[in-house]
Regions:
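Alpha/beta enzyme core
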Residues: 2-132, 136-147, 174
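Extended, intrinsically disordered, low-complexity segments
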Residues: 135-179
């Protein structure tokens, strides 16, 4: 099963927290969602994380106030999305890190300053995610690969950056699947 479930206060349609144009539901509505999730949970091993996107919509103080209200519901972790400065990151940690795990979301090119997991841990964050980093790395590689293929009409210039057929099969476990 799921180890943790994230419930957020964004309105529909959902947007990435680092994009503009978001809205947030009223605090009481979000508290109702959190209480319902906490009441419905069948195992204490399933954690409930409350996420707020209020910073972009209502400002840092509203985001902190919402996080405080969500903490009061009894959630297991907090996520204040798209903290924009090191000062805001520290403010969130100062207010919450000694009471509940905080999640830091590192999006390359997003709103939050990128820091290493160890730096974030020293600051007070206990959960760090780098969502989409693999997709951005793969997209960058694909741009280079297809650009090279279009120019040279062959994969030869790109071969040193590729796995060959046998290497790929070893990586994905094809020999074990065929036995």
């Amino acid at each position: 099963g799921a180890a943790m479930i994230q419930i957020e206060d964004q309105t529909f349609p959902k947007r990435c927290g680092h994009l503009d144009g978001k809205g947030v539901v009223p605090v009481a509505e979000m508290q109702g969602k959190l209480k319902a999730a906490l009441d419905a949970r069948q195992s204490s091993n399933t954690l409930i994380l409350a996420r707020t996107d209020a910073l972009a919509v209502e400002g840092i103080q509203s985001a902190l106030d919402r996080a405080e209200a969500y903490l009061a519901c009894g959630v297991d972790a907090l996520f204040i999305e798209a903290l924009r400065t090191p000062d805001q990151m520290q403010q969130a940690c100062d207010q919450f890190a000694h009471r509940i795990p905080l999640l830091a979301n590192m999006v390359e090119g997003g709103q939050t300053p990128i820091q290493s997991a160890s730096e974030l841990g020293e600051r007070g964050f206990r959960i760090v995610i780098f969502p989409g980093g693999t997709a951005r790395a793969v997209a960058h590689s694909l741009q280079g690969y297809y650009g090279s293929l279009q120019m040279s009409q062959t994969t030869t210039p790109w071969r040193d950056k590729m796995l060959n057929f046998d290497e790929l099969n070893q990586l994905i476990g094809t020999p074990e699947l065929l036995t």
